[in-house]
Curated annotation (Swiss-Prot):
Gene name as annotated: glnA
Protein name (Swiss-Prot/TrEMBL): Glutamine synthetase
First-tier enzyme category under EC: ligase
GO biological process, one term: glutamine biosynthetic process
Record Pfam families: Gln-synt_C
Domain GS catalytic: 1-119
Binding site for ATP: E3, H67, Q68, S69
Species of origin: Trichodesmium thiebautii
Gene3D superfamilies: Glutamine synthetase/guanido kinase, catalytic domain (3.30.590.10)
Compartments, record wording: Cytoplasm
UniProt keywords, alphabetically: ATP-binding, Cytoplasm, Ligase, Magnesium, Metal-binding, Nucleotide-binding
Length: 119
């Protein structure tokens, strides 16, 4: 389900579409369906849709950011009384992401175009 959408700062008709959260596997399936629908609707209108991070040289890139949260028994375990209002679990979670950032790049930034967006 879509929560909201808006035109992005860049040119060439870039848009941001915010989707509602779901469990990891369900959200992965929903994203695949979403991309399939967007590609086919664009094609039906003689247009092209791309999800490339940097489709145009010299223009702003796009990214697919993902918000992450973990709950236990309906309670957000990231909320707490440590640094920045976070829990100890959240701080360890962030530390794990930082520690393994290079390995995470293998699937998070899977193409050369992902890095062009950062430059």
């Amino acid at each position: 389900p879509i929560e909201k959408h808006h035109h992005e700062v860049a040119t060439a008709g870039q848009n941001e579409i915010a989707c509602q959260f779901n469990t990891l596997v369900k959200k992965a399936d929903e994203i695949q369906v979403y991309k399939y629908v967007v590609h086919n609707v664009a094609h039906a209108y003689g247009q092209t849709a791309t999800f490339m991070p940097k489709p145009l040289v010299g223009d702003n890139g796009s990214g697919m950011h993902c918000h992450q949260s973990i709950s236990k028994d309906g309670v957000n375990i990231f909320a707490g009384d440590k640094y920045a209002g976070l829990s100890e679990e959240a701080l360890y979670y962030i530390g794990g992401i930082i520690k393994h950032a290079r390995a995470i790049n293998a699937f998070r930034n899977a193409s050369t175009n992902s890095y062009k967006r950062l430059s």
